[in-house]
C-alpha cells in the first residue's frame, strides 16, 4: 500500500520540501521558500510533467515581506491541497513528516521518531551546528503546531 510523506529541510532563511509516494519513492511535488524573514521572500513549486520530469509551475512567487517559516508552511499546505497545483485532497493524506537535521552528535546517526527528548537532544547539539540546528528544530516545531496529529 502506498503512503505519502512530506520531507522538510528548514534552514535559517529557507524551507525546502518534497512530497513522496512511498515505498515507490515517486516525487509528487517539491520546492523551496527562499529569503524568509527578509523584505523579499519567494516561493518556487515544482510538479512532474507527463514524462516525470519536475518542472516549475510557480517560480519565485513573492510572499509577504518578512514571511516566517510558519507563513511558508501555511502557504505550502494551501498549495499542496489547492485545486491548481495541489497533489493532495487534504493533509490527511500525509502519513508522516520527515525533517532533515544537520547534526545529531553522537546521539543520532539515522532516522528517529521526533519526541520531546529528541528535540532536547537536537537543542544540545546546537553548538555542533549553530547555524542549522536551531532552524531545523524550529521547522520541526512549526510543523508540529500547524500539522497537529501527523507524526
Model-derived regions, located:
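Contiguous, glycine/small-aliphatic-enriched amphipathic segments in soluble metabolic enzymes
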Residues: 27-95
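Short coil/turn connectors at secondary-structure junctions
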Residues: 2-3, 92-93, 147-151
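Active-site neighborhood for divalent-cation/phosphate handling
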Residues: 118, 122-151
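General structural feature for long, well-ordered alpha-helical segments within catalytic domains
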Residues: 15, 72, 76, 93, ...
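Fold-independent oxyanion-binding glycine-rich loops
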Residues: 10-11, 100-101, 136
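Gly/Thr-rich phosphate-binding beta-strand-loop-beta motif of the actin/hexokinase/Hsp70
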Residues: 2-46
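Short beta-strand-loop/turn "lid" adjacent to the catalytic site in phosphate-handling enzymes
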Residues: 69, 80, 84-131
